C-alpha cells in the first residue's frame, strides 16, 4: 500500500515512473485527502490508513523517504526502512533508533524482498 502526504495523482505518477504502478494501483493509495489533510507522522492518520487497508503493523514493512515519518510506524510495530534522501528535510532524524534499515534504491529493494518481479 502507498501512504502519502501528497495527492493520489502524484503517487500514481511516481509509481509509474518507478515501474511499480501495477503492484499498487489507485485503490491501494492512501493520500492526504484520505487522511483528512492531517499529514504523517500523526498517529491518528497512521491508524486510519491501517484500518482502511486492514494492515497489521507487526507484519508490515514501512518504507519512507522522510526519516522522521518512520517514527509512528516503529511505534506501531512495523519494520521501518528509510529510503535515503539527501534533502535536509528528508534526512532530519535519520540517526534515530526507529529506523530499522536504510536503502538507496527502492526498486532494487523491492526485487530483493520479492515484491517486484525481475524483468
Regions found by a protein language model. Name each.
Residues 4-6:
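Conserved phosphate-coupling serine/threonine residues in phosphotransfer and NTP-handling enzymes
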Residues 8, 14-119:
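Asp-based, Mg2+/Mn2+-dependent phosphohydrolase catalytic module
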